[in-house]
């Protein structure tokens, strides 16, 4: 709800209030002077009225030392605005207005305070005091109430107030006491915060809250020289970072003492100088000029020195504002943006033992690094091995024995314990450079009872359950004397056998054990003697793949020999324990058959893979081989098929190439067959379609049947592989002549020409058959299609057909042989229609 009262809003409120007051004052001055104070009896005349309700009107203006023209102008505007606002508000109580226009004529650092008496008698005044102000870009609302009682020549008062920093969301309550008499005013206040820490609006990584504290005000005047007076104020606040002298100068439990001189030569003008001194040599000096205009009094009295004495009396201070600090003094707290602790925080163990330690980080930002102060630790032989950004392995350093004379009598090892105790400190730093408080890790190295060394023989033996690895532990005292007949417990991990055994040292302090395993990898062997442990790692090597437990697969087993389609080889090697065999570096895939290309082998989490491509048609056998030994029982076969391709065209006993543009002539019920990969037997392995299914359909044998004219359009016949659906082959043709018999009766050349009308026949006989009887896809009817007698007799009657050798030379052609007889009287008309 307080967000409404931002700086701009407060500025607008005060500005509009000033403008409104100015208008009201100019129009209704006379009318207001005739009204009665709302909680007082009516007075007899305007002078008494103004005397009763306009006790104190003050305007304070601080003069800048530099005093340029702009400052003087703003000062004049400030003074005028203050006087007009006070003039209007003082009709309803006492106001103090501080209107500060800056260079842009905004109202930053302005304030308005209003004391409103709501019960007023000769002995008591009950009042409310309201205020609103802007300071340091914070808007503060003050709401208070109090009572003043008058006993003989003294006034005693008590007041309380609520202060609300609406901008920064800070709240406090204030309690004050007053004791005033003629020429002397004593005031004391206490301030108590109402809210706790929250994010500061002044600093990014700080919290803020009101600082609790108090102040004492003393103001006195000389009875003999009432124009001259002085003031003293002491204020102190509690807290570690308190902004008593501003947010840029934070102090711990700061205090300040303010002393000042007041000089009022005439009632209209008051001069003053204040000196404020505080902790750590803080020092401020302020010069003040105050101009007071007392309503209802004559102009002469405003400038009469004799009137000054009356203003120092208690009767004139009845409605003065409460002397207190309305601005909330803030305390700041550096946010602990990152915290560091260790778990565990204390380690205790024998030399060489390894412990895991985790850094517990609480941070608003990501961790950048942890800085260790471990020089003493490292020098002693300790190790701090990072496992991750927050996890460490701590390896304890050797124990430091001391000479017996250095030990405390009766407390063996006490001084040694101090020498063998290490404190490691660390600081965590986040990505913004914020540091945590140092965290400590205490490490206590215990005095060992034994010195245990280890020796491993035949490390790296096969994990076949038979081949052993021998581990020998030697146990001695600190002085290297062998420890005989000492019982110890040996345990192993990761499937090594025996998993646990109890044995005694021999005369040389030696305990030996032979280990076997079916599990590949590292096994930790631990010797425990009276709680003191020593460990050593042994490694069992991989067993070779067993052909019975292993598997090999190729997918797919059929591919196209285009050098692109892949078959994936997947080999899952398992040893005789049915364990997956990892780390094979000598795996190969051996091929036998048509040549193929095999990619490098890739080891995955649970298999080994490679890919196969080829360009040759046929079969190839693939066999995995490990260490030079082929696993023949796992052999798999891959068949490579030819790339789908239309290699020829069968037409009435002849086969044409696919690049000759066949057919150029077509006729009803003409037919031809496409040949896939050099053999029509392959045609059934494909699904056939035609782009002109109505006029040029194709059957499942790849036979194209001409059913109607295509009118010069390109016909596309597509063969899609049934085994490899993404692979297709196409053949396109575009006929340019549609040929037909003009009639079913024999006619003369003249009649045939008339029957076929404008058809040009010459192209139909430009065939090598006219000279040597051979066929070719040359665009001629018989050259492309051969004997017409093999086609539908209903379309082609048996006999000769008229055509033209030249534009005027008619000849006849035998429909069966393509021969051109020397002479013929009649024949069937052969017509051709362009498409």
UniProtKB/Swiss-Prot annotation:
GO BP annotations, alphabetical order: cell adhesion
GO cellular component: cell outer membrane
PROSITE patterns per record: BIG1
UniProt KW Membrane keyword: yes
InterPro entries assigned to the protein according to its UniProt record, in alphabetical order: Big_1_dom, C-type_lectin-like/link_sf, CTDL_fold, IAT_beta, IAT_beta_sf, Ig-like_fold, Intimin-Invasin_domain, Intimin/invasin_bac
Top-level taxon of origin: Bacteria
Residues of the signal peptide: none
SUPFAM superfamilies, sorted: C-type lectin-like, Invasin/intimin cell-adhesion fragments
Main location: membrane
Annotated ranges, domain Big-1: 451-541
Role according to the record: Invasin is a protein that allows enteric bacteria to penetrate cultured mammalian cells. The entry of invasin in the cell is mediated by binding several beta-1 chain integrins.
UniProt-recorded name of the protein: Invasin
Organism in which the protein naturally occurs: Yersinia enterocolitica
């Amino acid at each position: 709800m307080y967000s409404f009262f931002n700086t701009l809003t407060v500025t607008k409120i005060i500005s509009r209030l000033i403008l409104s007051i100015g208008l009201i004052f100019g129009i209704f001055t006379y009318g207001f002077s005739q009204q009665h104070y709302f909680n007082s009896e009516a007075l007899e005349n305007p002078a008494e009225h103004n005397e009763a309700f306009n006790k104190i009107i003050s305007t304070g203006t601080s003069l800048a030392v530099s005093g340029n023209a702009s400052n003087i102008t703003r000062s004049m505007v400030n003074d005028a605005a203050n006087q007009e606002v006070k003039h209007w508000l003082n009709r309803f109580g006492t106001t103090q207005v501080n209107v500060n226009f800056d260079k842009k004529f905004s109202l930053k650092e302005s304030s308005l305070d209003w004391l409103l008496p709501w019960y007023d008698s000769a002995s008591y005044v009950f009042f409310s005091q309201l205020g609103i102000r802007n300071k340091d870009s914070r808007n503060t609302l003050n709401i208070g109430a109090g009572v003043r009682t008058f006993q003989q020549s003294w006034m005693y008062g008590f007041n309380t107030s609520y202060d609300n920093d609406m901008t920064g969301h800070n709240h406090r309550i204030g309690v004050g006491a007053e004791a005033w008499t003629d020429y002397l005013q004593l005031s004391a206040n206490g301030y108590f915060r109402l809210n706790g820490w929250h994010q500061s609006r002044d600093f990014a990584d700080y919290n803020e809250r009101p600082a609790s504290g108090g102040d004492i005000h003393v103001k006195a005047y000389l009875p003999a020289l009432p124009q001259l007076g002085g003031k003293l104020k002491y204020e102190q606040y509690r807290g570690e970072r308190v902004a008593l002298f501003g947010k840029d100068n934070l102090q711990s439990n700061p205090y300040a003492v303010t002393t000042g001189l007041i000089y009022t030569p005439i009632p209209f003008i008051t001069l003053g100088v204040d000196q404020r001194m505080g902790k750590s040599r803080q020092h401020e000096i302020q010069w003040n000029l105050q101009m007071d205009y007392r309503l209802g009094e004559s102009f002469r009295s405003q400038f009469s020195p004799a009137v000054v004495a009356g203003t120092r009396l208690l009767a004139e201070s009845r409605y003065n504002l409460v002397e207190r600090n309305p601005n909330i003094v803030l305390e700041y707290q550096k946010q602990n943006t990152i915290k560091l602790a260790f778990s565990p925080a204390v380690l205790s163990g024998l030399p060489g033992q390894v412990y895991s330690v985790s850094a517990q980080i609480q941070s608003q930002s990501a961790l950048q690094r942890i800085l260790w102060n471990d020089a003493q630790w490292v020098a002693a032989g300790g190790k701090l091995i990072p496992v991750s950004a927050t996890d460490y392995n701590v390896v304890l350093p050797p124990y430091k024995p001391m000479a017996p004379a250095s030990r405390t009598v009766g407390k063996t090892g006490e001084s040694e314990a101090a020498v063998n105790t290490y404190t490691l400190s660390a600081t965590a730093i986040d990505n913004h450079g914020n540091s945590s408080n140092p965290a400590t890790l205490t490490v206590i190295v215990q005095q060992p009872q034994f010195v245990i060394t280890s020796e491993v023989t035949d490390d790296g033996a096969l994990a076949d359950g038979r081949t052993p690895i021998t581990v020998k532990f030697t146990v001695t005292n600190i002085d290297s004397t062998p420890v005989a007949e000492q019982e110890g417990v040996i345990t192993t991990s990761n499937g090594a056998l025996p998993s646990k055994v109890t044995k005694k040292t021999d005369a040389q302090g030696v305990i030996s054990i032979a280990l076997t395993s079916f599990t590949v990898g590292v096994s930790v062997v631990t010797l425990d003697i009276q709680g003191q442990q020593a460990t050593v790692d042994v490694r069992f090597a991989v067993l070779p793949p067993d052909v019975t437990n292993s598997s090999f697969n190729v997918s797919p087993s059929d591919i196209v020999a285009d050098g692109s389609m892949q078959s994936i080889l997947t080999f899952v090697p398992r040893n005789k324990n049915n364990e997956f065999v990892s780390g094979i570096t000598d795996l190969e895939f051996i091929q036998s058959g048509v040549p193929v290309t095999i990619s490098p082998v890739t080891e995955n989490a649970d298999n080994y893979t490679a890919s196969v491509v080829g360009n040759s048609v046929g079969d190839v056998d693939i066999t995995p081989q490990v260490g030079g030994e082929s696993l023949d029982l796992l052999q798999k076969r891959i068949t490579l098929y030819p790339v789908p391709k239309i290699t020829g065209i069968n037409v009435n006993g002849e086969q044409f190439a696919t690049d000759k543009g066949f057919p150029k002539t077509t006729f009803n019920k003409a037919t031809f067959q496409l040949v896939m990969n050099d053999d029509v037997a392959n045609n059934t392995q494909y699904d056939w379609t035609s782009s002109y299914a109505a006029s040029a359909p194709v059957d499942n044998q790849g036979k194209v049947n001409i059913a109607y004219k295509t009118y010069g359009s390109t016909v596309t016949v597509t063969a899609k592989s049934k085994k490899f659906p993404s692979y297709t082959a196409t053949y396109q043709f575009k006929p340019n002549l549609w040929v037909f018999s003009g009639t079913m009766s024999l006619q003369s050349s003249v009649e045939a020409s008339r029957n076929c009308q404008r058809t040009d026949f010459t192209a139909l006989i430009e065939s090598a058959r006219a000279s040597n009887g051979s066929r070719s896809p040359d665009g001629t009817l018989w050259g492309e299609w051969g004997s017409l007698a093999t086609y539908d007799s209903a379309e082609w009657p048996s006999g000769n057909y008229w055509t033209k050798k030249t534009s005027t030379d008619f000849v006849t052609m035998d429909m069966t042989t393509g021969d051109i007889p020397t002479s013929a009287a009649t024949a069937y008309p052969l017509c051709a229609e362009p498409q």
